[in-house]
Amino acid sequence: MIVIVGVAGVFIFARPDKNDSDRDYRGAFKRHYKIFTPELPEKADFAGERVPLHDLLVRESLDREILAFTFMHSTTQQMFKRAHRYFPIIEPILKKNNIPDDFKFLAIAESNLGNATSPAGAEGVWQFLTSTGREYGLEVNSKIDERYNLIKATEAACKYLQEAHDSFGDWTLAAASYNRGFNGLERAVRNQKVTNYYDLYLNEETARYIYRILAAKEIWEHPTNYGFYMKESDFYPPIKTYTIVVDTTVEDLPEFARERGLTYRILREFNPWIHDYSLPNKSRRTYILTLPEKDAMLVSTYSDRKPSETFFHDTLKINEIN
């Protein structure tokens, strides 16, 4: 306490007690900061194949991945935002190749729909190694890397998955082999004498892999159960584009872009498989370049999207949340 004696009297100023301040802070923290454990779904399936959630280890493995998605907020929000732009590209390719729609969630487990590079050298949304990409028809060299071409890489992934399904006779094992490698998973199945993914003892990454896919699917389909209240307007919209067929060498890609009212940066953003300033093409291959339509890069182009009345994948109205 500080006491000041003046002519008019005595003035007393009370210095705040630090313990009181800390106590108030802790009280506010306890009142407002709460973490709830999300409930697991009663049933789950992948590509129409049932997940044995009655098995304790299976249930706890799914719980681990759902917790990861639930509390890695920025990563999961990115999943929702990117998926609204890229699922419309991926889904029809899966359908055309008779691959179950659930495999779009495999791309989330691989890269969260971003052009990632793994420590092992796998690249692109579908995370192909150089050798595997070439095996499934992708051009990979210093100037062109079609692992970054979402359409072609999705087609290549479909070819692999169909071959794996033909061999294993099971979509879940086919998905697991995408992570472990065909030979590695086949060896595990043969040595352990089981034909069910959920009965296999696997390396940690592959042991978690299917559960990560399942968790992505569950949270995508029931986001508000896990605390994600998102409006359609929160998502990245599909960008309006057109294509140009190129079957000759393009010596100067920055100039090619400029002639079309674009920058080299925009050309690369929409064609990340191009890795140089030129597009050599002595063999006269056909390349398809994707370019944005006029004004497609302006935020105002998408401002007329109809406002959401309810949250994504939920009947709860936005004005009813409390």
Where are these regions (language model features)?
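Substrate-binding/active-site groove segments that recognize
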Residues: 121-142, 154-156, 161, 185-188
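Catalytic and binding regions of secreted/periplasmic enzymes and modules that target cell-wall glycans
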Residues: 161-188
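LysM (lysin motif) carbohydrate-binding repeats in extracellular/periplasmic proteins that recognize
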Residues: 253-281
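Second-shell loop/turn segments in exported
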Residues: 69, 73-80, 90-93, 113-123, ...
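Extracellular LysM carbohydrate-binding repeats and other cell-envelope/extracellular binding modules
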Residues: 270-308
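An acidic, Gly/Ser/Thr/Pro-rich helix-cap/linker signature
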Residues: 1-98
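Primarily a LysM-type cell-wall glycan-binding module
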Residues: 231-261, 316-322
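Short, functionally critical alpha-helical segments immediately adjacent to catalytic or ligand/cofactor-binding
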Residues: 99-114, 174-180, 267-270
